[in-house]
Every structure is written in structure tokens, then in C-alpha cells.
Amino acid sequence: MSTQSPTSTNNNISNIANQCNKRIAMVCASNQNRSLEAHHLFVKNGFKNIRSFGTSAHCKLPGPSIHQPNIFSFGTPYQEIYTSLKNQDQELYIRNGLLNMLERNISVKLAPEKWQEEQQSKFEIVYTFDQRVYDAVIEDLLQRDVSSSLLQPVHIINLQVKDTHEEAVGGAQHALEITSIIEKTLNWEEKLDQILEDFYKQTSRQFLHTLMFY
């Protein structure tokens, strides 16, 4: 039985990315860890129409203690957040991986964005990485004006991912794999539930899926 080499697999994903014109959003709570890991991975593999967002009231990152989180407003540049944490306690934030995470974020885009504030862009697929975020995205879409005759479908897919650096990597990889399957599937929208069911059987990654129009 033949197996694909990593180079062959990477080439396949790159080919899929080059052909993909879907607008895809990655959403987590603070647009810092899980959504940015996925955003970074997709861009790294050649996908073009990728955005990422958070749904919380503000961006919360671990601080000196569980009772002292670092709070930043959406729109605060990642470079500014990086400098703030580095000046606060460089050793701590190197040790817990926050500075490394922020270096990645800086390479992807300028600043964290809030999902509820993006009213212009339309997406065909929205990946969320926590059920509370999934619920927040759905609640937001339900509150939007749907009187237009130009409503478009959006598939919201939640992959349940713990908010750790390690889990974020796995969640991003699974989102990439699902997208690759979607791109190779004719009439994918009709078959998406089965695609996700099959993926769950293979990976045990819990998921939720709903179709909305906006």
C-alpha cells in the first residue's frame, strides 16, 4: 500500500488552496490563539480569502495570576500587546508561550478584530473553536437585518478546541483538513453533514454545524 510523502501532501494542499475561492472566517473568543493559529495555517498553505475574529467584549490574555488577566481592547495592535507584556514580565511570557504566540499574530495581521463589528464582509464558511463562540456568532447573525433580497448562505462549523497553544495547533489542522475535503467534494453543501460525521469518526473531534443566511 502506497503512502503520500509530506511533500506530496503539502503540494496537494497548496493546489487545493490555489483553486479555493471561498471566503472563510476563523473565530474564537479573543482573536489571539485558536482563530489566529488557524488563520496563520491557512495563509501559510496558500489560502487567500481568510479572516479571523473574536466575539468577547475584550481580548483577555493570561496575566501574573489567574485573578490578574491582561485585558486589551479589540483593535489594539499585536505589536503593542507584545511590547506591553514584554515590559511587564518578559521571562513569564516567554515561559508560558504568549510572546511566541504574539510574534505569530504579528506576522498574520495588524490587530485583533471583533466579529460583531464586521458588518460588510460575507463568508461562506465560518469556523468557530468553542461552543460559546459558535452561539455568539449565531446570535449575532440572528440580530442582523435580513430584509435584503441578496441573502447569502453561510455554514458555521464549530470544532471544540481547548484554549491552549497545543490544542490550537490540532484544531487548526483539523479545520484545514475539513476544508481540503470540502474543496474536493462535488456539491459539498449537500454533503457537509456527512463529511463532518465521517471526520468525527476518524478524529473524535466534536463538532456542531448550522446553515444560516445573511
Curated annotation (Swiss-Prot):
Keywords: Hydrolase, mRNA processing, Nucleus, Protein phosphatase. It is found in: Nucleus. It catalyses: O-phospho-L-seryl-[protein] + H2O = L-seryl-[protein] + phosphate; O-phospho-L-threonyl-[protein] + H2O = L-threonyl-[protein] + phosphate. Transmembrane segments: none annotated. Its EC number is 3.1.3.16. Its main location: nucleus. PANTHER family: RNA POLYMERASE II SUBUNIT A C-TERMINAL DOMAIN PHOSPHATASE. Belongs to the SSU72 phosphatase family. This is RNA polymerase II subunit A C-terminal domain phosphatase SSU72.
